[in-house]
């Protein structure tokens, strides 16, 4: 019962993390286009572009996952039915937050680790997210167990239905009668 009640809080933390990551992405983007080098700005370097692209992609993926989970909670009105996705966003949240915070610090250079910027606090916050409300590993186990429930009734462990042997057998069952009809028509 307590795990069910915590679901809303976990989604709320994930939404707040989306906001924090968005601020970090904005900060690193502003720094990239404003930090001058001899030939332009650091935004001109592919390594900086890759870090910004990775941060943008990870943030968008995480944001959409959080929105989907919130939509499913609204749809089902039952946290237990969305337990796997709630656990998944809880497990993913500290990694996304950590990776984006680390990139932001890196793009800011020594300024990023100074007490003039909030980024070290973000990095520490990401580590706290991985421990608070249950360690990430516990949530990953929940995701795996919930996911594997759909695969409990395996018919033949020696030759699963996706093996080439089984697929060929099904193809023969489906198409051999058609071949006989075609041959008879000729």
Please give the residue ranges for each predicted region:
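Alpha-helical interface subdomain recognition
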Residues: 3-186
């Amino acid at each position: 019962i307590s795990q069910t009640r915590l679901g809303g809080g976990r989604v709320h933390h994930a939404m707040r993390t989306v906001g924090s990551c968005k601020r970090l992405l904005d900060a690193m983007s502003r720094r990239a286009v404003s930090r001058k080098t001899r030939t332009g700005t650091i935004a001109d370097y592919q390594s900086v572009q890759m870090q910004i692209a990775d941060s943008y992609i990870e943030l968008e993926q995480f944001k959409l996952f959080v929105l989907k989970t919130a939509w499913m909670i609204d749809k089902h009105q039952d946290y237990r039915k969305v337990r796997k996705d709630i656990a998944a966003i809880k497990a993913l949240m500290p990694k996304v937050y950590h990776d984006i915070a680390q990139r932001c610090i890196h793009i800011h250079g020594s300024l990023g680790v100074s007490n003039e910027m909030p980024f070290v606090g973000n990095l520490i916050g990401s580590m706290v997210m991985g421990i608070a409300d249950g360690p990430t590993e516990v949530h990953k186990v929940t995701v795996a167990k919930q996911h594997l429930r759909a695969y409990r009734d395996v018919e033949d462990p020696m030759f699963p239905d996706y093996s080439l042997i089984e697929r060929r057998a099904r193809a023969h069952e489906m198409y051999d009668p058609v071949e006989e009809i075609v041959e008879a028509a000729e």
